[in-house]
């Protein structure tokens, strides 16, 4: 049985309580269609060791497998997209590392089971790189990284374009959650109304999804 705390001291200092798996699943069942949409994005602002994100990834990967298991390149493309749709922030460095590791293991277990020795190192490297970008050591309250000095949290948006090309755009977290911007304009509108569209702080040219680990300076 999984524990809900790592240590009493961590609860006192950081309010850390881990969500039990049965509660995670019950909560995700409330938004089941979104958890099964491969490109639907999720952010966990206090991700801990990744219980929510892993459960979402496992659901997405089941969809990817059902649709694309007969084609390795198609499976790889959409499995990478599924991983790239998940974001997390945690104030504790060991949680961040464990969350990245567990997400990678969830991906790799499914990938290896399907393709065995045909699994590509490039695909694994792409997933590791994306997880380093998407799971951030930071403070969701201050909207900054836990570094010296702190820096604004940046998130990378990943989108498939023209088949196997992956487009990256970086956004400042504080812009995405700006109360003034959110009050002035909604994020989405089905009535053709003007909406709030955040501006990226950096826009990158598309690259093949298997090349992302070596396509950027970071």
For the regions a language model picked out, list residue spans one by one.
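SAM-dependent methyltransferase catalytic region
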Residues: 2-218
């Amino acid at each position: 049985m999984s524990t809900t705390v790592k240590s009493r001291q961590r609860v006192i200092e950081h309010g850390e309580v881990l969500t039990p798996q049965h509660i995670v699943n019950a909560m995700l069942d409330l938004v089941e269609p979104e958890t099964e949409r491969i490109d639907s994005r999720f952010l966990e602002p206090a991700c801990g060791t990744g219980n929510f994100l892993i459960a979402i990834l496992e659901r997405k990967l089941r969809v990817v497998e059902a649709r694309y298991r007969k084609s390795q390149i198609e499976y790889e493309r959409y499995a990478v997209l599924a991983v790239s749709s998940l974001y997390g922030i945690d104030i504790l460095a060991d949680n961040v590392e464990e969350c990245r590791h567990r997400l990678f293991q969830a991906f790799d277990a499914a990938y290896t089971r399907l393709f065995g020795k045909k699994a590509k190192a490039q695909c694994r490297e792409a997933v590791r790189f994306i997880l380093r970008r998407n799971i951030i050591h930071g403070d969701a309250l201050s909207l900054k990284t836990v570094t010296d000095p702190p820096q604004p949290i940046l998130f990378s948006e990943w989108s498939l374009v023209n088949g196997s090309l992956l487009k990256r755009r970086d956004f400042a977290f504080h812009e995405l959650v700006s109360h003034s911007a959110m009050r002035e304009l909604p994020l989405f509108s089905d009535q053709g109304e003007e909406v709030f569209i955040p501006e990226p702080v950096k826009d990158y040219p598309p690259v093949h999804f298997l090349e992302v680990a070596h396509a950027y300076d970071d």
